[in-house]
Structures are given as C-alpha cells and as structure tokens.
C-alpha cells in the first residue's frame, strides 16, 4: 500500500508549514535524503515498487500525457521511512540516459552530482497512509532546460 495524496500541491515558500512545522527542515533539505536518513535511522535500503515507461500528466510541470519513466520506491530501515516517485520525460533521459532506468540505484547519486541539474521549486501536500497523515514534498528540477520532478512522502513526524 502506498500513500494517497489528500490536498493539492502548494508552493513551499520557506515559511513554517502550520500543520507540520516540525517537518520544515526535511521539506527544505537540498542534499541527499539518504545520507540524512542514515544518520537518523541507520542503513537505508531502496525497494523499487515499480519503474516503467508510461504517459504522465503533471500540473506543476505543465505536462499533458508526456511519455517518460515513472519510478516508485520506498526508502526503508526497520520500516518504510519515505515513499518516493520520480518522473523523467523522454526529453530528460535523452539528455541523461541513466534516468531512463535507475532500477535500485539511489536517485541522489546522480541528482546532486550533476552540475547541469538544479532545483527550481518545492511544493508541499498532505498524504494519508492507513489512518496516519503525513507531509510530502514535490521538487521540480531542471536538467539543461528540461524539467522533471521528485515526490517524497515522509512517513514520520520529526
């Protein structure tokens, strides 16, 4: 079972999020989540739920039925810690072919080591999983003029 989005995405402006203010440090994190999560939870494993070529529509990117690679994963320690999705259009992975098929490799390995990739915007939304409520972020990145997103739902309340 994966988290379900409950609210629309709202642009995160760096101010305290009233409902989840304790999560603002995670929302504004600009480095690899895995490194920070390992400091908190120990060894982090990546479980790929699905990775496939598909058509995808996205309001924040202005995409309507764009073909690309959609990957869904859990970052896990003793339990699921973060649920993540990433979408790379075919235009993105033509510029960086590894994004066509990441398999079990952590995205941050490439995201934070490529000078052509820059973060443009961060959005927040509320999610639910079972009876629990969580906060998610959606980061919009640019790779040499082409945009893609990474969604991370934090399955904890720090």
Spell out what each predicted region is.
Residues 1-129, 143-158:
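N-terminal domain-onset segments
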Residues 134:
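Conserved, well-structured functional cores that handle cations and Mg-NTP chemistry
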């Amino acid at each position: 079972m994966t988290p379900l989005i409950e609210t629309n995405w709202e642009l995160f402006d760096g101010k305290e999020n009233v409902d989840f203010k304790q999560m603002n440090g995670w929302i504004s994190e600009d480095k690899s989540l895995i490194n920070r999560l390992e400091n908190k939870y120990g060894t982090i494993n990546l479980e790929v739920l699905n990775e496939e070529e598909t058509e995808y529509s996205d309001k924040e990117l202005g995409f309507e039925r764009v073909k690309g690679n959609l990957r869904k994963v859990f970052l896990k320690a003793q339990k699921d810690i973060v649920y993540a999705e990433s979408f790379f259009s075919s235009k993105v992975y033509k510029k960086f072919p590894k994004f066509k098929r990441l398999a079990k490799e952590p995205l941050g390995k490439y995201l934070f080591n490529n000078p052509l990739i820059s973060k443009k915007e961060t959005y927040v939304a509320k999610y639910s999983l079972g009876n629990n409520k969580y906060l998610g972020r959606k980061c919009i990145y640019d790779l040499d003029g082409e945009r893609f997103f990474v969604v991370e739902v934090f399955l904890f309340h720090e």
